UniProtKB/Swiss-Prot annotation:
Domain of life, source organism: Bacteria
Protein's UniProt name: UPF0337 protein XCC0070
Alphabetical list of InterPro entries matching this protein: CsbD, UPF0337_stress_rsp, YjbJ_sf
Renumbered residue ranges of the record's region Disordered: 32-62
Family assignment from sequence similarity: Belongs to the UPF0337 (CsbD) family.
Pfam family, one: CsbD
Organism: Xanthomonas campestris pv. campestris (strain ATCC 33913 / DSM 3586 / NCPPB 528 / LMG 568 / P 25)
Length: 62
C-alpha cells in the first residue's frame, strides 16, 4: 500500500475533525482550514490509490 494513501486518509480524518470543531465553535477560519485539509487528504489518498493501481498493473504484465 502506497504511503500517500495512508497519509492522505489521515489528513482527511484530521481535516474532518478540524472542520467539525470550527463549525461547532463558530470559528469559520478553523472550519475552512479543516475543509481544505480534508480535500488535500482526499487528493493525496487518490494519488496513492492510483500509484497502487499502476504498481499492480505492472506486476500483472510481467
Amino acid at each position: 500500500m502506497d504511503k500517500n494513501r495512508i497519509e492522505g486518509a489521515a489528513k482527511q480524518v484530521k481535516g474532518s475533525v478540524k472542520e467539525a470543531i470550527g463549525r461547532v465553535t463558530g470559528d469559520k477560519s478553523t472550519e475552512l482550514e479543516g475543509a481544505a485539509e480534508k480535500n488535500i487528504g482526499k487528493v493525496q489518498r487518490k494519488a496513492g490509490e492510483l500509484a497502487d493501481d499502476v504498481r499492480d498493473a505492472t506486476k500483472s504484465t510481467r
